[in-house]
Amino acid sequence: NPTTYTVEDEITLIKPTKRGYNANWDNGGKISKGSIGDKTFNANWTAIVYKISYNLNGGTINGENPTTYTVEDEITLTNTPTKRGYKATWDNGGKIAKGSIGDKTFNANWEAVVYKISYNLNGGAIDGENPTTYTIEDEITLINPTKRGYDFANWDNDGKIAKGSIGDKTFSAMYTPVVYKITY
């Protein structure tokens, strides 16, 4: 942009640029032919509004997170999506740093919650090993324990964890005494 003009000049100033902002000159940034006197132009900066979108990847969200931001904002998402049996994290830790520009999309990333499995063998023992944890994605059938002098009857809770199950589980082994013959 020029730094001087004469009464014969007609000037339209080029808009200044600044990352994350739109600008306009006051007075329209123009000097008309025939103008006289010193001129001062001030740039009027307006932060560009960018869109924020969300991909919940099968989850749901209670509450709202921001849908727009500007270069002046620092955003931390406070509402995390939920999905049965999973915990979520957002891309980028759910943050937009001050000074960022451009539309943003946050994806929900899902990790299966790990639940505990506890056992009460009631004096029995297992030949092998039953799992001590599971997730909503697992399907488990327990190994039955043995107990000297007893037949294994059943596990409470059927000794199975169906795919889609959630929550910590405790299984107790049930036995029936072996009936022995006495011969005389």
Label every PLM stretch briefly.
Residues N1-Y184:
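Secondary-structure capping and domain/repeat boundary segments
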